[in-house]
Amino acid sequence: MRLSLLKTVDVRYCKGFSDDAIASYVLQAPAALETLKLENTNASVPEATQEQGLAAVRQYYEQLQADAVISEHLKVVVTGNGRVGKTSLVQRLQEHYTGSTAKPLPSADDRTIGVEMATLKGSLVMYDFGGQPEYWAWHKLFLTAGAMYLVVVDLTDSTETCTDALREQLGILSCSVPGAVVLLVGTKADADIADAQQRASELNSWTGNWLAERRKVAVKPGVHGQREQDAAAELPRIQGDMLITSSRSLDGIAALAKRMEDLSVQAEPERLFLHYRQPIPKVYQQVGVLLQGMKYGLSTSELLEAVAQCKVAEDEHDVQRQFVSMKEIETLWESAATEAQVALKNASAREVLQVALPILEGEGSVLLSPVSGIVHLNPAWLADAVRPLADHRLHQMTHMEDTAQSMEDRELFPDYNLAHRALREFVQRGIASRQLLEAIWLDVLKTYSVDYATLNDLLCEHKLMFPAAGDRSSDFIVPVKLPKLPPEEFAALCASSSEAAVVVGKVRTRFIPPGLMQMVAAALHHLGQYRCYFRYGGVLE
């Protein structure tokens, strides 16, 4: 009798309950129950759904019980420093899965700018991240829970260089994706296989020590009282020793592909990817089919047929729409759910949509911009939009000069000097005029049929830039382009402000998440006017 009066049930970290047992309890839970905490259990309910509350969890299990299909997509993110061979690795994996002949590898100058996307064997949605530090803050757009992360190092680099890279990348994942599933990959082993094996062994030892230290710090008594299970759950889950590969000799490529396959379906000692090749509610897959059909520009009748069949016809399709408004999706989904007689159970079409979208985002199929009310049907377009702002080549004088000349030739600026001045101010001070943004986005705006205001608002929503103030209110600050050192007036402004509250202290840390200070600057800009700013600080009045 007392159990029926419970308002909160906490089974976090209880691995003894199967997903079926949890589902049975949820579907028969007493009316008094208000909160059910399921973190780090065998529950198949996505974390994003759990965060929506008990009603969403119950809806998930009701839909799963009503009708289920097998999930076929897994997001894989390849990250690491620049020039370590990430793009070559993705190319060799693609060739391995298709059985095609090995093609020439990308040249050293053919580096990834921002993010590149590809799909391997029809199910692995690959995100290949550019490795230059200026890109790391942009990558947070694409870091989501439920993905597999390949952290890549170059085994011809020194052990110190490799450990610095691992510390950086694992730190980013710790901050952005608690509990990320990580596979360590070493490349370029063909240069000296014995040396590569020795370096990989040293890096394995370092990684074990790093995890032990992070766990020790996280659960240090008297600091913030975090439970040991919570601390362990937040750290990257590194899967075994580093895999040694060579994209030139192809050594280790097949072993890497097999390891990825084994991890993707692993059930013991725990399932790492709760939904890949597992049953999910059919109705959520139907939402995904609707979005896929919208991406390909299907007619209303074709969309209804696709939703009813729970698949888009296997004809070759070109992407017609990159993103759509949430309102349009809601209207179409409500119509499709009615016309196709979708089994909604006790939920409304809108409630089902709210639960389905985060699941689809976790698969890598879509990206959500909730403030703007936009769903990105083709996340690659957003990567293309970010790329001109993040382009590391603008720091090279010859590339900046060539770009300025191109802008004059295309009549985007009245003359070369004005274009060069705008580019220089962007690279050196992080300030982008509207004219410069329209110029560097010209191809993006045309290719994706998006207007300047929409793209501007999207990047501001994700704190990738924010409006300047004062007499430059039409310009924008791009935080990741801000200079590392404070301007000359910074010290004087700090000293002259008698009303300022000043706190001086030391923080002992070996890692600050990329983009953290820039995001703080973006979040605070509406509180006043920046008198001056740089990458790690500023004066706001």
Regions found by a protein language model. Name each.
Residues 1, 17-26, 56-62, 136-139:
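Leucine-rich repeat
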